[in-house]
């Protein structure tokens, strides 16, 4: 008879994780399950967060790929909110993400303070959210009021249709995940 008490704890954790992933894969449609690379999922999931000694805003300022986002956060007067008490999760579009947007749309968003605030707060959730841990799409509520979908699929970790980095940055008041496109809320 197999004795779990003699089985190493780390092996039990790994076995438990594999069992959880397998059960999630079996719960999916066959074509969806076939597209998830289990090795890549487990590898991405186990990448440790980079520790940053400052706030979300400090981390963004220290990241050259986020200079466009930083300038928009300053323009929207959101530095105080993103430097305050957390935890918050920010899905941070890179400079390349903003460069992919049509210039007219970026100009429109940047010139309207209310619209800019709506777009930026759509990238922020209260609490800890990790896009690497969701084989089944999971909804999270944004500070803007609408929801985002976090998932891990054949393309890796994603937020809505945007690809998220497997390596996040943990700050004193939350976590920052780089994403490859700007998320746009539904405008009513």
Roles of regions detected by a PLM:
Residues 16-27:
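Bacterial N-terminal signal peptides
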Residues 2, 32-188:
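Mature, structured domains of secreted/extracytosolic soluble proteins
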Residues 1-11:
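N-terminal secretory signal peptides that target proteins for export/translocation
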Residues 11, 15, 147-148:
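A short, flexible low-complexity segment enriched in Lys/Arg and Gly/Pro that occurs
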């Amino acid at each position: 008879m197999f004795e779990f008490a003699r089985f190493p704890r780390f092996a039990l954790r790994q076995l438990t994780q594999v069992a959880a992933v397998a059960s999630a894969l079996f719960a999916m449609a066959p074509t969806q399950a076939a597209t998830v690379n289990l090795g890549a999922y487990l590898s991405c999931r186990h990448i440790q967060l980079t520790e940053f000694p400052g706030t979300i805003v400090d981390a963004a300022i220290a990241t050259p790929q986020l200079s466009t986002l930083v300038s928009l956060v300053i323009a929207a007067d959101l530095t105080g909110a993103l430097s305050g008490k957390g935890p918050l999760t920010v899905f941070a579009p890179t400079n390349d993400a903003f460069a992919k947007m049509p210039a007219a749309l970026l100009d429109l968003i940047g010139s309207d303070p209310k619209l800019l605030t709506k777009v930026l707060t759509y990238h922020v959730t209260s609490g800890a959210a990790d896009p690497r841990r969701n084989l089944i799409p999971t909804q999270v509520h944004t500070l803007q009021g609408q929801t985002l979908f976090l998932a891990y699929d054949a393309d890796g970790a994603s937020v809505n249709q945007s690809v998220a980095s497997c390596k996040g940055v943990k700050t004193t008041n939350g976590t920052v995940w780089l994403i490859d496109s700007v998320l746009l809320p539904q405008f009513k």
